[in-house]
């Protein structure tokens, strides 16, 4: 069958060294993890390998990507929607996932559920990580203010200071927690480190005893070293958990 008109020319254009170089440059600042063959993504971390992790899906397609990253780190992954039956028992770690919604609408069924779940994790000292919407919920429970951004972040890559390390990460948020300080002390949950924008006070991430959170998406293709960033957050949670990993 004859080639479609212009197909040969288009093929030659795509194969041109300068075109290929330009296309490769576009990939310089995105996550290499997602460019690898799935069979070559495994990178188990000793402190995490074999642990059981529950992801609570708050209606976000990014949840599946988080699952792939956690599996690559050697964790045994279970995913449950926020509105279906699940339990924290039987899991070593919990990831409260991202999702659409206004975290200020505490009467909304999903927001109410996330608030109750995060409160229980905090009170029971269960090791967990909260992402995006769940991060915002955690921030409000810790007493931080929350505001709508003038311009939403919808697939915006930024370089941030993440607890002393510069990371290029992807943001997808309409709301943001704010803090005037790099540290806050909660009467029940202890001292919490705050990664934030020094100019605006927008909170990028939190780390406390047995928990961590991030406003950005470590699983996004826009987060260059997302798997490492996620692994470091989980490892910090394991190491700082007041009672270690709970038996179930």
Features from the language model and the residues they span:
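Pocket-forming structural segment of enzyme catalytic cores
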Residues: 115-120, 124-131, 136-228, 232-236
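Secondary-structure transition/capping residues
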Residues: 74, 148-149, 241-245
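Residue-level detector of alpha-helical recognition elements and their boundaries
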Residues: 78, 109, 152-153, 248
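RNA-binding accessory domains that recognize and position tRNA/RNA substrates
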Residues: 1-61, 185, 219-248
């Amino acid at each position: 069958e004859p080639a479609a008109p212009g197909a040969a020319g288009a093929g030659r254009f795509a194969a041109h060294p300068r075109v290929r170089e330009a296309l490769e440059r576009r990939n310089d600042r995105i996550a290499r993890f997602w460019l690898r063959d799935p069979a070559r993504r495994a990178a188990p971390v000793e402190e995490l390998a074999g642990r059981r992790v529950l992801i609570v899906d708050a209606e976000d397609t990014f949840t599946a990507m988080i699952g792939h990253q956690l599996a690559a780190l050697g964790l045994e992954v279970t995913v449950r929607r926020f509105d279906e039956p699940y339990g924290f028992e039987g899991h070593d770690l919990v990831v409260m996932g991202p999702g659409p919604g206004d975290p200020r609408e505490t009467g909304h069924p999903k927001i109410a559920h996330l608030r109750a779940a995060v409160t229980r994790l905090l009170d029971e000292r269960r090791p967990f990580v909260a992402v995006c919407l769940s991060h915002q919920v955690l921030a409000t429970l810790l007493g931080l203010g929350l505001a709508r951004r003038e311009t939403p972040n919808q697939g915006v890559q930024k370089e941030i200071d993440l607890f002393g390390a510069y990371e290029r990460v992807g943001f997808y948020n309409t709301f943001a927690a704010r803090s005037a300080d790099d540290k806050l002390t909660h009467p029940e949950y202890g001292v919490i480190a705050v990664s934030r924008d020094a100019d605006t006070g927008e909170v990028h991430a939190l780390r406390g005893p047995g928990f961590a959170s991030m406003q950005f998406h470590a699983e996004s293709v826009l987060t260059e070293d997302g798997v490492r960033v996620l692994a470091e957050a989980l490892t910090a949670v394991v190491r700082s958990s007041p009672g270690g990993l709970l038996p179930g």
